[in-house]
Amino acid sequence: MSHSVKIYDTCIGCTQCVRACPTDVLEMIPWDGCKAKQIASAPRTEDCVGCKRCESACPTDFLSVRVYLGNETTRSMGLPY
């Protein structure tokens, strides 16, 4: 199942999210916006299983990577749409 994965410019280029992803959804790409000169990218969101290990691994105060599960999460929790 595919999920929306967003990478924010608060990414510090640490690679923790990339290493945590069990389905290789994430990769690092060159970026001049941080000291590490790289940022996470999510080119294979169709492989995302929604485990959110990338979010858990992110060391920034504001999570630089977020997984949005969509309506199936709301349904599974029994909440109205």
From Swiss-Prot:
- In the Enzyme Commission scheme, what number(s) does this protein have? 1.97.1.12
Report the enzyme's class at the first EC level.
oxidoreductase
The record's GO molecular-function terms, alphabetically, read: 4 iron, 4 sulfur cluster binding; electron transfer activity; metal ion binding; oxidoreductase activity
How does the entry describe its membrane topology?
A: Peripheral membrane protein
Record's catalysed reaction(s): reduced [plastocyanin] + hnu + oxidized [2Fe-2S]-[ferredoxin] = oxidized [plastocyanin] + reduced [2Fe-2S]-[ferredoxin]
GO CC annotation terms, alphabetical: chloroplast thylakoid membrane; photosystem I
Q: Where does [4Fe-4S] cluster 2 bind?
A: 21, 48, 51, 54
Q: Which UniProt keywords apply?
A: 4Fe-4S, Chloroplast, Electron transport, Iron, Iron-sulfur, Membrane, Metal-binding, Oxidoreductase, Photosynthesis, Photosystem I, Plastid, Repeat, Thylakoid, Transport
Cofactor annotation comment:
Binds 2 [4Fe-4S] clusters. Cluster 2 is most probably the spectroscopically characterized electron acceptor FA and cluster 1 is most probably FB.
Question: Which superkingdom does the taxonomy of this entry point to?
Answer: Eukaryota
Sorted alphabetically, which InterPro entries does this protein's record hold?
Answer: 4Fe4S_Fe-S-bd, 4Fe4S_Fe_S_CS, PSI_iron-sulfur_center, PSI_PsaC
The protein's location, in the record's own words, is: Plastid, Chloroplast thylakoid membrane
**Record keyword Oxidoreductase present:** yes
Q: Is the keyword Electron transport assigned to this protein? A: yes
One biological process term in Gene Ontology? photosynthetic electron transport in photosystem I
- Cofactor(s) the record lists: [4Fe-4S] cluster
Binding-site list for [4Fe-4S] cluster 1: 11, 14, 17, 58
Record domain 4Fe-4S ferredoxin-type: where? 2-31, 39-68
Oligomeric form and interacting partners: The eukaryotic PSI reaction center is composed of at least 11 subunits.
Q: What does this protein do?
A: Apoprotein for the two 4Fe-4S centers FA and FB of photosystem I (PSI); essential for photochemical activity. FB is the terminal electron acceptor of PSI, donating electrons to ferredoxin. The C-terminus interacts with PsaA/B/D and helps assemble the protein into the PSI complex. Required for binding of PsaD and PsaE to PSI. PSI is a plastocyanin-ferredoxin oxidoreductase, converting photonic excitation into a charge separation, which transfers an electron from the donor P700 chlorophyll pair to the spectroscopically characterized acceptors A0, A1, FX, FA and FB in turn.
What protein name does the entry list? Photosystem I iron-sulfur center
Instruction: Identify the species of origin.
Output: Acorus calamus (Sweet flag)
Q: List the lineage, top down.
A: Eukaryota, Viridiplantae, Streptophyta, Embryophyta, Tracheophyta
